[in-house]
């Protein structure tokens, strides 16, 4: 339904979870004609294939493990898109992961840890996760783990390494897991824009 609305002002649609829509006008319309719609997934092969078949961008939410392990999913996505006849700028991949940038790796680890521990404590109680483990935190915050927590050189190098596996066009960092001081958050944003982004661009250009 969302895709139908995105394509046309007047929508006629039949589905399985709501009553039919017959010639309904949906307003207001996007300024640029169409909304950019992505399919988000935590690593489901069917979701990757579906995004490819629909010709939509795919965004992988990576919260643990080795991000490079998503490479087969990115390949499946692109293969499915090609088989469905979809090519061009809409066939792209993004990654969303935990991360925080500080002047030094040790500062980043120290600053991100309280929010991470609180999240695992609260959510773990609800979901049956094991208690927060400092060793697990450190493993995920160093390559090949899924947390992009470090200084600008470290984070940039790891983003570029992941790009060699996924070919992703965007990399989102979820920095605040709750309680992150504003000055720490703003410094991380500033370093992302002024230090990490230029490094990533230079490294990719030289590859």
PLM ranges: what are they?
Residues 1-207:
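Active-site-adjacent structural elements that line small-molecule/cofactor binding pockets in enzymes
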